[in-house]
A protein has these predicted regions:
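Rossmann-fold cofactor-recognition segment
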Residues: 69-79
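Amphipathic terminal alpha-helices
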Residues: 2-7, 361-383
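Catalytic helix-loop patch of NAD(P)-dependent Rossmann-fold dehydrogenases
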Residues: 117, 122-125, 145, 150-225, ...
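N-terminal Rossmann NAD(P)H-binding glycine-rich loop of SDR-like oxidoreductase domains
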Residues: 25-46
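Mid/C-terminal beta-alpha module of Rossmann-like enzyme folds, strongest
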Residues: 35, 39, 271, 278-335, ...
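NAD(P)-cofactor binding segment of oxidoreductase domains
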Residues: 110-138
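NAD(P)H-binding glycine-rich loop region in Rossmannoid oxidoreductase-like domains
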Residues: 81-118
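NAD(P)-dependent short-chain dehydrogenase/reductase
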Residues: 212-260, 266-267
Length: 383
């Protein structure tokens, strides 16, 4: 398998074989510098070889090797139709995995034009070129397409946690049992693919619009993967932010009334490769198992980081409601986007769909582990 991450266009992609089954098929990965693109390349390199099933609906063992090219924005601007056409003409891809996205949730409230250009127009232009060329498109979306429902139980539970913390005067950083239980029976069920989206923010609306544009062009041939609370060893994400703050700040306030599920980028990458290898289409949800609040996530990050000597001393972690956090931000002149109070995704459809073609992709079934286990796997790589 050939993996290339470069600013230089290749002069040729796949002309080394005379038999159709052995001619490598090209996979383009957009947003090469994103944490997901890096995870896709890392997983592919660890596996050593990827291959398409030439007939995903049968038991045939015929496979086609893949060549991977990860393209940065300077190499492939997904909002530029002319640039896209030139890149497709040069590489002639069989698959495109779109990791390029505008992910600045708060900034999008004041930059809706750019958010929609990248998150909606870009996927649409990619889909149009895929339709013209016969390539397949896998587009990555977000749990933030959901969240329009009011979840009073979460707010009430969060208020109780905050009040208890204030009354006790305890900064919760040493005992994980002090973290609130975000899995009471009265919480909503995780979202499935057929649930109606109802985004709250400009970012969420732009991601939903991107999905709709892709499906409008490709119909049933589109592959869309929604994920949540993505983190990894590379890039800007909640885990790296918390670790940096825990090394420099005496205490932290973390939101307690937004419930979701953290997802390790490497696990998502493994799932994406399985979808590509099996040439699956449809809308799928993927996250780790379980659910938590940002506050619980922060407490668990610190607990594990201390155990792995990634942190030398604990810091105080105090729960705060979204309303209070927003007020504090406004007092500092910062406007925050609305976020869903509950955006847990059900991965059941995806899990039942996938049939492992390469055992190396999931030797320990980490894709279906609890979020705490996935977090531990990632943090151990940093220790």
């Amino acid at each position: 398998m050939k993996i290339v991450v470069t600013e230089a266009m290749p002069t040729q992609c796949a002309e080394a074989s005379t038999t159709e089954a052995s001619i490598p098929q090209v996979v383009l990965i957009t947003g090469a510098k994103s944490q997901l693109a890096q995870a896709l390349l890392r997983i592919a390199a660890n596996i050593g070889e990827l291959a398409l099933n030439s007939n995903a609906n049968t038991s045939t063992n015929t496979s086609i090797p893949l060549e991977l090219y990860a393209l940065s924005r300077s190499q492939l601007d997904i909002t530029d139709a002319v640039n896209i056409a030139a890149v497709f003409d040069q590489y002639r891809p069989s698959w495109v995995i779109n990791c390029a996205a505008y992910n600045a949730v708060d900034a999008a409230e004041h930059d809706a034009i750019e958010a929609n250009r990248v998150n909606a127009l870009g996927p649409e232009l990619l889909a149009q070129q895929c339709l013209l060329s016969g390539a397949r498109l896998l587009h990555v979306s977000s749990d933030y397409v959901f969240g329009g429902q009011a979840v009073c139980e979460i707010a009430h539970a969060a208020e109780r946690v905050v009040c208890d913390a204030r009354e006790s005067g305890v900064e919760q950083h040493q005992n994980p049992d002090l973290a609130p239980n975000s899995n009471p029976n009265h919480l909503p069920r995780p979202f499935v693919e057929l649930d109606a989206p109802e985004p709250l923010s400009t970012y969420g609306k732009s991601k939903l619009l991107g999905e709709l544009k892709v499906v409008a062009v490709l119909g049933d041939g589109a592959t869309i993967v929604r994920t949540s609370w993505l983190y990894g060893q590379n890039g800007h994400n909640f885990v790296n932010t918390m670790l940096n703050l825990m090394r420099t700040q005496p205490s932290l306030q973390v939101i307690v009334d937004q419930i979701g599920c953290p997802t390790w980028s490497d696990s998502l990458a493994k799932v994406i490769w399985q979808l590509v290898m099996q040439q699956r289409s449809g809308v799928f949800h993927y996250s780790a198992q379980g659910q938590c609040s940002w506050y619980e996530f922060a407490c668990e990050i610190q607990r594990q980081a201390l155990a792995l000597n990634l942190l030398s001393l604990p810091v105080g972690i105090l729960p705060i409601t979204s309303a209070d956090y927003t007020k504090q931000a406004l007092n500092r002149g910062i406007s925050l986007a609305k976020r869903p109070s509950y955006s847990v995704l059900s991965s059941g459809k995806l899990r039942s769909t996938l049939v492992t073609l390469n055992a190396l992709l999931m030797p320990e079934q980490i894709e279906w582990q609890d979020w705490r286990q996935q977090l531990n796997r990632m943090l151990r790589r940093l220790s």
